[in-house]
Amino acid sequence: MKLAAPNPQALAPLPIDVVSIQSQVVYGQVGNSVAVPVFNGFGLRVAAVPTVVLSNTPHYPSMHGGAVPLDWFEGYLADLGARGALAGVRVVQLGYLGGPAQAEALGRWIAGLVAERPDLRVHIDPVIGDHDSGVYVAPGMVAAYRDHLLSLAQGLTPNGFELECLTGLPTGTMEQTIAAARTLLGGRARWVIVTSAAPATWPPGRVRVAVVTHDDAQVLEHAHVDTAPKGTGDMFGAALTGHRLAGQPVAEAARRAALQVIEALERTREAGCGELLLAGPLR
């Protein structure tokens, strides 16, 4: 006798720890293409929501793809709720966005989640650009972050250039960087981690990261590795979130995440690889 297939509506949904909303590439190690393996290394289940789908990053001679259509993007988010997958979500992680309309849609969606779950962690890497390349996102993204997303974040990980764009304040010195970061600590925000903080002040061969809270500011320092694959910020953000969910205080989580990135960079340099090679087992 042929048994009837079980009704999927009657079965328990897949438990999801992290909703990671970032870019996706067919070839390379950026956005969710690097973040998901890092999350999995912590034993976390991830719902990976693409904002753009590209063949590779734009620094290659050819690239195909683009932003996910807005109706698809909103549908991805809505269907996570419809499948009952959001009940146990511990963190929503945001990276590269395809444009201001996505930011606005995300703001509405996250606000709805936070209204139901005030303790929900929202970690945002406000991807805008960097000192070397300038702005490399769609026009209007700085205003979109300010208008729709910053007030929902529990934690933010801008680089120094992005911090200056978001706040309109100087970030040339570490003192200025810390002061600018503190202006983002309103609403739900508890911490701001500034990567590549005040680069003009670094000792030779070193890189500094500022970890800023309402009550404290710590400056972490690590070695500069002479290679520059894309995706290090995405890897750092995922590792940071993994360590935070494992119970580490924010400064220690940042230290451990930076160490993982350094190990990956050293492995990448030794292999002579043009794409980021993830480091070995977590410590």
UniProtKB/Swiss-Prot annotation:
Enzyme class: transferase
Cofactors: Mg(2+)
GO biological process, one term: pyridoxal 5'-phosphate salvage
Classification via SUPFAM superfamilies: Ribokinase-like
Residues the entry annotates as binding ATP: D125, T157, E162, T195, H222, A223, H224, V225, T232
Keywords, comma-separated and alphabetical: ATP-binding, Kinase, Magnesium, Metal-binding, Nucleotide-binding, Transferase, Zinc
GO cellular component term, pick one: cytosol
Nucleotide-binding as UniProt keyword: yes
Pathway listed: Cofactor metabolism; pyridoxal 5'-phosphate salvage; pyridoxal 5'-phosphate from pyridoxal: step 1/1; Cofactor metabolism; pyridoxal 5'-phosphate salvage; pyridoxine 5'-phosphate from pyridoxine: step 1/1; Cofactor metabolism; pyridoxal 5'-phosphate salvage; pyridoxamine 5'-phosphate from pyridoxamine: step 1/1
A GO MF term: magnesium ion binding
Catalytic activity: pyridoxal + ATP = pyridoxal 5'-phosphate + ADP + H(+); pyridoxine + ATP = pyridoxine 5'-phosphate + ADP + H(+); pyridoxamine + ATP = pyridoxamine 5'-phosphate + ADP + H(+)
Ligand binding (Mg(2+)): Y136, E162
Enzyme Commission (EC) number: 2.7.1.35
HAMAP family in the cross-refs: PdxK (MF_01638)
Family, as annotated: Belongs to the pyridoxine kinase family. PdxK subfamily.
Protein name: Pyridoxine/pyridoxal/pyridoxamine kinase
Species assigned in the record: Bordetella pertussis (strain Tohama I / ATCC BAA-589 / NCTC 13251)
